[in-house]
């Protein structure tokens, strides 16, 4: 299936976990892919090589998403390298949690910079290169709707902010043919949150299906939203969480 043939996609934080799965899935669907990474250069290279082996073009760009200038430069470089930009996936994020009194200014600033300001800055930069059929998709979290453990206030706040951003951008960019959506993954088996981790059984128990998601399952929803099949979906927050929020 080549639903994304001829499209160029940029995935922030695309070297690992859900971001890497999204990069690989969009490439499988026919897109050329640019991904950003902060530190995982080896993993980023592995993803790029996998994409190239499948016959698509790919590029990895080092960028700290907390620095707006670096993120904007990455967006512009992606568009310049491949001649266009059709799809932006805001995936990069930080997960800083703990008791309220233990979260200092540094943790708050880092969370706001990466989880809120970066998606907004990336959208600002990307939309300059997008035409009819452009797609902006952000990766949120199920805890934007259901925070089942204490200590999640800062992270939950940052992901909830994406709901407002998504709705506002969808209304603004709809007349330009650009859709904007938000995907809220539930517990997903990644190196940061493995399905065999110490609290995994408890976390999986909060889902209706009793298990973690595979990263590829989250990527499948992103691919649908990025394709023409998702053209009438905009301003939506979609829970891909195994019934965690049911």
Where are the regions a protein language model picked out?
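Substrate-binding pocket helix/loop in short-chain dehydrogenase/reductase
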Residues: 99-100, 107-109, 203
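Short C-terminal tail/terminal secondary-structure segment
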Residues: 146, 223, 234-246
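Active-site helix of classical SDR
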Residues: 123, 158, 166
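Alpha-helical segment proximal to the catalytic Tyr-Lys
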Residues: 128, 171-172, 231
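Short, small/polar-rich loop/turn modules that mediate ligand/substrate recognition or access, typified
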Residues: 174, 179, 233-235
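Conserved glycine-rich cofactor-binding loop
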Residues: 15-16
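A conserved structural motif in NAD(P)-dependent oxidoreductases
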Residues: 207-218
């Amino acid at each position: 299936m080549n639903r994304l043939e001829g499209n160029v996609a940029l995935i922030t934080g695309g070297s690992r976990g859900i971001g890497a799965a999204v990069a690989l899935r969009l490439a499988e669907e026919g897109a050329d892919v640019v991904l950003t990474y902060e530190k995982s250069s080896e993993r980023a290279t592995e993803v790029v090589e996998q994409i190239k082996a499948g016959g698509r073009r790919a590029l990895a760009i080092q960028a700290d998403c907390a620095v707006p200038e670096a993120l904007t430069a990455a967006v512009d470089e992606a568009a310049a390298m491949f001649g266009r930009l059709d799809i932006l996936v805001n995936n990069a994020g930080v997960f800083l949690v703990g008791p309220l009194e233990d979260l200092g200014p540094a943790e708050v600033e880092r969370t706001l910079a990466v989880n809120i300001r970066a998606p907004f800055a990336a959208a600002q930069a990307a939309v300059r290169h997008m035409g009819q059929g452009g797609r902006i998709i952000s990766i949120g979290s199920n805890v934007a709707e259901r925070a089942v453990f204490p200590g999640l206030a800062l992270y939950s706040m940052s992901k909830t902010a994406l709901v407002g951003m998504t709705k506002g951008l969808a209304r603004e960019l709809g007349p330009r043919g650009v859709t904007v959506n938000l995907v809220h993954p539930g517990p997903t088996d990644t190196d940061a949150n493995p399905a065999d981790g110490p609290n995994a059984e408890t976390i999986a128990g909060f889902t209706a299906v009793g298990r973690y998601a595979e990263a590829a399952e989250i990527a499948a929803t992103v691919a649908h939203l990025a394709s023409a099949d998702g053209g009438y979906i905009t301003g939506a927050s979609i829970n891909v969480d195994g019934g965690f929020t049911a």
